[in-house]
From Swiss-Prot:
This is Probable dihydroorotate dehydrogenase B (NAD(+)), electron transfer subunit. Its cofactor is [2Fe-2S] cluster; FAD. Binds 1 [2Fe-2S] cluster per subunit. Binds 1 FAD per subunit. The lineage of its organism: Archaea, Methanobacteriati, Methanobacteriota, Thermococci, Thermococcales. One of its GO terms (biological process) is 'de novo' UMP biosynthetic process. It comes from Pyrococcus horikoshii (strain ATCC 700860 / DSM 12428 / JCM 9974 / NBRC 100139 / OT-3). It comes from the Archaea. Pathway: Pyrimidine metabolism; UMP biosynthesis via de novo pathway; orotate from (S)-dihydroorotate (NAD(+) route): step 1/1.
Length: 247
């Protein structure tokens, strides 16, 4: 059921990326999402970065409208929905690419993991968000495509060199990056936060189909084994149902 929340604060965390904190603390598992409704605009899913926080990149009409909201304005939300990350013992890698950082941030902050290594990449220094995540991990490795901060390259470059260290890899980011993570790990010891176009968020409409799964109901977090024989990393579906290749 939709419920109204009030924005307590909003702030810019990186280039074209904004944080929105609201006045309700949600009981959630890192990796779960909420549906956010703006009257007269649309409704969209966002992974929770914290109990009362979403972090959003401006990419279209909905997020552009969201960016105009300020402290004291209202949002309408429902959820949390979906299946989140399952915690595994040992040293783990948290791999984030671009705006894939929010659920990884939530896992770093709230997960009771033994040893956490964050591998986080963005196009450039100005697109790195939520860097206070360093307070919740044991090691942080930053990569940028242009070399403006940290190591020049991609998170998967780092993972490929260190994959044997980790009992589990948790990842969220662009699908091409996630497909590479699965390839590096041979679809083993991985939990991936997947994205598909989503309408209902509760497993009714089928818009977010991914192989035999519905992302909203069965995900958004999947194991590598679940994704191995699906189209993940090969093609996705547009809002009108058309297939779009990813490579």
């Amino acid at each position: 059921m939709l419920r109204r929340v009030t924005l307590k604060e909003t702030w810019e965390v990186a280039k074209n990326i904004k944080a929105f904190r609201f006045d309700e603390k949600l009981d959630f598992t890192p990796g779960q999402f909420i549906m956010v409704w703006l009257p007269g605009v649309n409704e969209k899913p966002f992974s929770l970065a914290d109990k009362d926080l979403i972090v959003v990149k401006r990419v279209g009409p909905f997020t552009s409208k969201l960016f105009t909201l300020e402290e004291g304005d209202y949002l309408w939300i429902r959820g949390p929905y979906g299946n989140g990350f399952k915690e595994v013992k040992g040293k783990v890698a948290l791999v984030a690419g671009g705006i894939g950082i929010p659920p990884i941030y939530a896992l770093a902050k709230h997960g009771k993991l033994e040893e956490k290594v964050l591998i986080y990449g963005a196009r450039g220094k100005d697109e790195l968000a939520l860097l206070d995540i360093e307070n919740y991990v044991d090691e942080i490795v930053i990569t940028t495509d242009d070399g403006s901060y940290g190591i020049k390259g991609f998170p998967t470059d780092v993972l490929a060199k260190r994959k044997e260290e980790f009992s589990q890899v948790y990842a969220c980011g662009p699908e091409i990056m996630l497909a590479k993570v699965l390839e590096i790990m041979n679809y083993e010891r991985t939990q991936i936060s997947a994205e598909r176009y989503m309408k209902c968020g509760i497993g009714i409409c089928g818009s977010c189909a991914l192989g035999p799964y519905l992302v909203c109901r069965d995900g958004p977090v999947f194991t590598g084994e679940q994704l191995k024989d699906t189209e993940f990393g090969k093609f996705t579906r547009l809002p009108d149902g058309r297939i779009k290749g990813l490579r």
